[in-house]
């Protein structure tokens, strides 16, 4: 007779977050479909497994110890319509291309993670949006409400969590097929990068591309097992913004009797929801997943230490990742005291730069792009600070796409504002396009090579 799996409903403490303040929370508890939606999510299969989550923790422990580099990228906010094979393969392909370049530059393995298969919600600075005298709830991502500016579309609908779950499942299925079925073959990915370097706009990166080419040919000449290089590990992560969703997908691991969030391998807490006494920190502190926290320019060393005490009291390498999003103008001044305080405490979080969120600008035309030069400058500042302090710059977290969008100004093959009318496609924040993403990877590889 099979012993039933332990239930998260019986595990102590998993619902204490409900008694705390909850920032950015949808107004849907009174919706007639709320209870049924939660009940269904409580019963669905996990999207990821505890063993995979544990493997990611061990990989991130390597990053914390300076033995690997962490790459995370994907959409600002995924859309249900964007979960097609072409769109998903484009994002995965771009991340794989970036990872090959970073692996060569760092001379270290790269932990690859998509900001995918669950990034369907977004925090907003205002609960409401007004257009032409009409005020409606803000768009909070397709797992909460619709983008169209109508009363019907903007209702917070809990049934959208179910669609988000099923869309995430199909996305993860495709990711696993791509990364385990030959799509990730090192030689194929490298050939794509040679095409990038052949563009005259990116001539400065041709030398490194050719060095990688020689390394691949050398491996082949030495009889390397390229069959083993046809597959790769690839993890999924998203911001754990919707606690109703995350709690409903919490499962108790039958091996350890410990709770895991099974909506993703990696979950992070945003800058707007990292209140130490808040619901987000409380729930995620109880899960065994590796956890990230976004740190903005207002973060103090004391803030970081209190977050460590709350989320990583055992000081386990690989448990906690600090994702700094301070802005190019702030990072060289604001980041050092935070790192020093953490170093002096003996904690070993992974340090990752998010060079996107602190660098959004507003143009008179109404568009909100990022400037590629600002993104690059924040990355450069991140590496400079770590070099000066003797600490390890563990990774980069970018909002990007595999498509030829025009949302971030500049780059070696520059995007101009005149392109926005036809190619500015994001429903939320601006993303690096395919070529800009690869250029960032080559630049980071240069910084890593210099550090070595």
Q: Predicted regions: what is each one?
A:
Residues 117, 356-357:
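Short glycine-enriched loops at secondary-structure junctions
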Residues 66-67, 351-353:
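Short coil-to-beta-strand
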Residues 307, 313, 319-351, 357-406, ...:
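Non-transmembrane, aqueous-exposed alpha-helical and coiled segments at domain scale
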Residues 77-78, 83-327, 370, 378, ...:
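Active-site-facing alpha/beta catalytic cores
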Residues 1-3, 344, 452:
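Polar low-complexity intrinsically disordered regions
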Residues 54, 58, 344, 442, ...:
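Polar/charged alpha-helical tracts
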Residues 1-145:
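Long, contiguous, compositionally biased segments that the model treats as domain-scale units
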């Amino acid at each position: 007779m099979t012993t039933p799996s332990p239930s998260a409903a019986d595990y102590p403490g998993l619902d204490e977050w409900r008694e705390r303040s909850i920032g950015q929370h949808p107004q849907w508890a009174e919706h007639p479909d709320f209870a049924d939606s939660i009940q269904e999510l409580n019963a669905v299969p996990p999207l990821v497994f505890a063993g995979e989550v544990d493997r990611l923790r061990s990989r991130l422990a390597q990053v914390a110890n300076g033995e690997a580099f962490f790459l995370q990228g994907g959409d600002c906010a995924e859309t249900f319509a964007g979960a097609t094979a072409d769109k998903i393969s484009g994002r995965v392909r771009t991340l794989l291309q970036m990872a090959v370049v970073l692996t060569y530059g760092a001379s270290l393995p790269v932990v690859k993670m998509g900001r995918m298969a669950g990034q369907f919600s977004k925090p907003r600075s205002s609960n409401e949006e007004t257009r032409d005298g009409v005020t409606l709830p803000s768009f909070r991502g397709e797992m909460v409400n619709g983008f169209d500016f109508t009363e019907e579309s903007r209702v917070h609908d809990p049934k959208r969590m179910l669609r988000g779950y099923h869309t995430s499942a199909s996305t993860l299925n495709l990711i696993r097929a791509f990364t385990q079925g030959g799509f990730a073959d090192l030689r194929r990915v490298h050939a794509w990068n040679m095409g990038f370097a052949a563009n005259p706009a990116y001539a400065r990166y041709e030398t490194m591309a050719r060095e990688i080419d020689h390394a691949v040919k050398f491996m082949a000449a030495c009889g390397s097992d390229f069959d083993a290089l046809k597959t790769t590990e690839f993890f999924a992560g998203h911001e754990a913004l919707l606690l109703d969703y995350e709690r409903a997908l919490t499962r108790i691991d039958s091996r350890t009797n410990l709770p895991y969030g099974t909506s993703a391998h990696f979950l992070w807490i945003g800058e707007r929801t990292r209140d130490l006494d808040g619901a987000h920190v409380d729930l995620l502190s109880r899960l065994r997943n590796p956890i990230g926290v976004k740190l903005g320019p207002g973060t103090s060393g004391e803030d970081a230490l209190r977050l460590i005490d709350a989320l990583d009291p055992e000081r386990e390498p690989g448990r906690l990742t600090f994702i700094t999003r301070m802005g190019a103008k702030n990072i060289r001044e604001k980041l050092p005291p935070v790192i020093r305080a953490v170093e002096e405490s003996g904690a070993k979080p992974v340090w990752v730069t998010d060079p996107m969120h602190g660098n959004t600008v507003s143009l008179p035309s109404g568009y909100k792009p990022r400037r590629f030069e600002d993104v690059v400058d924040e990355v450069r500042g991140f590496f400079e600070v770590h070099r000066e302090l003797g600490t390890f710059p563990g990774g980069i977290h970018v909002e990007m796409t595999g498509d030829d969008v025009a949302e971030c100004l500049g780059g070696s093959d520059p995007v101009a504002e005149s392109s926005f009318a036809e190619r500015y496609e994001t429903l939320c924040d601006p993303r690096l396009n395919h070529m800009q993403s690869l250029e960032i990877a080559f630049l980071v590889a240069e910084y890593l090579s210099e550090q070595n």
